[in-house]
Amino acid sequence: MKKSTLLNSELSYLVATLGHTDEITICDAGLPIPDEVTRIDLALTHGVPSFLETVRVILSESQIESVIVAQEFAQVSPVLHEALYRELKAEEQLCGKPIAIQYISHEAFKQRTLQSRAVVRTGECTPYANVIFQAGVVF
């Protein structure tokens, strides 16, 4: 059995095969996922797993150089948005590299998911709790 934090085999494979600038979307239970993009559905029930739990695991297993979020996330769900911001700042401190944050409209965000290697669906039911991670390099 694997000892590290990430146990889900599909997600583990995805993280292990990321190249520089590849993108992963982590989304709430309601974001439409394009048929053309691989779906990794972790949702069990409302809130399980949470958006932040999933973000933390992905951050612990991969190097992220930038993120994209919808402008609406900060406006409509400021508490969870602030929690994501704190996680990103903590990751910057841990890895010693900046993580750029880009804000776009929710409609543009949905279109951008088409560029993701995969969309990871959580059980999160907070509006606009979605983020696109762009992979960095560890060196």
From Swiss-Prot:
Q: Which Gene3D superfamilies match?
A: RbsD-like domain
Q: Which reaction does it catalyse?
A: beta-D-ribopyranose = beta-D-ribofuranose
Q: Which GO terms describe its cellular component?
A: cytosol
GO process annotations (BP): D-ribose catabolic process
UniProt keyword terms in alphabetical order = Carbohydrate metabolism, Cytoplasm, Isomerase
Enzyme Commission code: 5.4.99.62
Which GO-annotated molecular functions does the record name? Answer: D-ribose pyranase activity; intramolecular lyase activity; intramolecular transferase activity; monosaccharide binding
**Is Isomerase a UniProt keyword of this protein?**
yes
What is the active site of this protein? 20 (proton donor)
Question: Can you state the subunit structure given in the record?
Answer: Homodecamer.
> Mind telling me what this protein is named?
D-ribose pyranase
Species, as recorded: Vibrio cholerae serotype O1 (strain ATCC 39315 / El Tor Inaba N16961)
Give me the gene this protein comes from: rbsD
